[in-house]
Regions:
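Flexible "cap/lid" loop of the alpha/beta hydrolase fold
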Residues: 103-148, 175-179, 184, 204-205, ...
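Conserved HGGG/HGGXW glycine-rich cap/lid loop of the alpha/beta-hydrolase fold
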Residues: 28-66, 85
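Conserved loop-alpha-helix segment in the C-terminal half of the alpha/beta-hydrolase fold
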Residues: 198-230, 243
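Gly/Ala-rich beta-loop-alpha elbow adjacent to hydrolase catalytic centers
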Residues: 88-92, 96
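Active-site loop/oxyanion-hole signature of alpha/beta-hydrolase fold enzymes
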Residues: 55-85, 121-126
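Catalytic His-Asp charge-relay segment
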Residues: 191-197
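Glycine-rich His-Gly loop
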Residues: 32-35, 90, 112, 198
Length: 248
């Protein structure tokens, strides 16, 4: 594995003994994080899946644009034999939509943006503004950041104080270009997809969620906020493990 490629994969080498991309054959699960956060936000889900013997890769984004983020995930997917299960949370849905994956794989949109042709994150968000808009700001470099007194209430109100505090440590800035670009392709048109709706999601407007969810082959609703990967990692693990088993 090249040094450049190893940077595409999140903290799995540190947390899981350097087993990055050692697998060949079978079904792998690729996890893609949301805006202004790091891949470590998936730690609870990744640990749960690996505890069940699943093959998991967490990809770090923040490459400067949506196209670069998509290329980083594509590089990892290309090293894994299809079928793969690719799960994108929040902004991660923009990324997984642009992947070149075949009909034997599966896309899971976890409270995520699910764009059609020509739709950027900014365009989707402005169509039906949700609570996330109240958190968006820019830093001195002009990059997007999430902050404000309502951050916990909007992003993860259904987690404990320790989990919320840990999640805040994973926040970082992200290049605005990531939100201006549309995906290079729309993978869900040929690859089976599942959309997970959080009934108490305050980050995305429900009208937008319903519009995007209607594009998926399967829709599941959970009684969660925008961040079930933190509040109900057990549900996410069960869903991805079942999807993985269905493709094996």
């Amino acid at each position: 594995m090249s040094r450049r490629l190893s940077r595409n994969v999140s903290h799995l080498g540190r947390h899981y003994g350097g087993r990055n991309l050692q697998y060949r054959g079978g079904v792998s699960i690729v996890l893609v994080h949301g805006r202004c956060l790091t891949g470590a936000v998936w730690d609870l889900v990744a640990e749960g899946l690996r505890g069940r013997g699943r093959r998991v890769e967490v990809v770090e984004l923040h490459r400067g644009s949506l196209l670069a983020d998509t290329a980083a995930v594509q590089e990892v997917v290309d090293l894994l034999e299809e079928p793969v299960v690719v799960c994108g949370w929040s902004y991660g849905g923009m990324v997984i939509t642009g992947l070149a994956v075949g009909p034997s794989s599966h896309l899971v949109y976890l409270c995520a943006l699910m764009p059609a042709e020509g739709e950027s994150a900014i365009e989707l968000g402005s169509r039906h503004p949700g609570g996330l808009a109240a958190l968006v700001d820019t830093d001195e470099a002009g990059d997007l950041v999430l902050r404000g007194d309502q951050l916990d209430e909007i992003l993860w109100p259904d987690v404990g104080s320790e989990t919320a505090a840990a999640a805040r440590t994973k926040l970082r800035s992200q290049a605005m270009q990531s939100f201006r670009e549309a995906p290079p392709r729309v993978a869900w048109r040929q690859t089976p997809s599942t959309y997970v709706v959080g009934r108490r999601d305050r980050a995305f407007h429900r009208h937008l969620v319903d519009e995007m969810a209607s594009r998926a082959a399967t829709v599941i609703e959970w009684d969660t906020s925008h961040s079930p990967l933190l509040s109900r990692p057990d549900l996410v693990v069960d869903l991805l493990a079942r999807t993985d088993a269905g493709l094996a």
